[in-house]
Amino acid sequence: IQLARNGFYGAAPNPMVGAVIVHDGKIIGEGYHVRCGGPHAEVNAVRSVRNPELLKESTIYVSLEPCSHYGKTPPCADLIVEKGIPRVVVGCMDPFAKVAGRGIRKLQEAGIEVTVGVLEAECLALNRRFITFHTHHRPYITLKWAESADGFMDSLRTDYEKEKPYAFSTPYTRMLVHRCRAEHQAILVGRQTALADNPSLNLRMWPGKSPLRLVIDRRGDLPGHLALFNDGAE
């Protein structure tokens, strides 16, 4: 799971996956899915093994079910069968329609011992965005707001142009907000927030790519000078 997290920024929209190969109680290979379109975790783990002959007496641990279909890369289940790895331990099933248990069946039909559901909750949580999309057919949504101890989200203002919004966030929590932006593909606010706070909604305090900015506005007449329309806005 820790290995898989290394692919957070590069693997999307694919899931994060980590793989570890163990022989006689010792790790002899490891890998993770670095970027979409590149080799999967199982491939990188196999390639990292110095003595391929040991694979025939090893166990491969993988956080997500090995794929069984041809996409941008060949099936990882086929690679495991080809290398003669006798045991596979899987964290959780892959809900993607082209996999969804087929990888497990392919391994079992080849005579490989397969164990599924080890640290399953942690593996599902790791790819909660991917899992939500393929099981509920909707985006994974995170709600974010800042409020005072007595439940207020802003001071009373009558002129948004002259009166700036009251900042409840600390430097540390602002950094966490930008980390959250880096971990999501889009950020959504309403018309009133766009006018009252004039937010940039871009990424500044954390490495990564700024999310797609979305505004719900029934009127469709937001002024063009708002910061969210300017990529360089600070």
Task: Mark where each language-model region is.
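Short, basic/aromatic recognition patches
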Residues: 1-12, 133
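Short, small/polar residue-rich loop motifs at catalytic or cofactor-binding pockets
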Residues: 13-16, 140-141
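Short beta-strand scaffold segments in enzyme catalytic cores
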Residues: 17-25, 144-146
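Zn2+-dependent cytidine deaminase-like catalytic core
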Residues: 21-122, 212
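Short, charged, surface-exposed secondary-structure boundary motifs
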Residues: 100, 125-126, 223-225
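A polyampholytic, Gly/Pro-enriched intrinsically disordered region
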Residues: 109-116, 133-143
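Short, structured interface segments
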Residues: 117-134
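Active-site ligand-binding patch in enzyme domains
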Residues: 132, 140-234
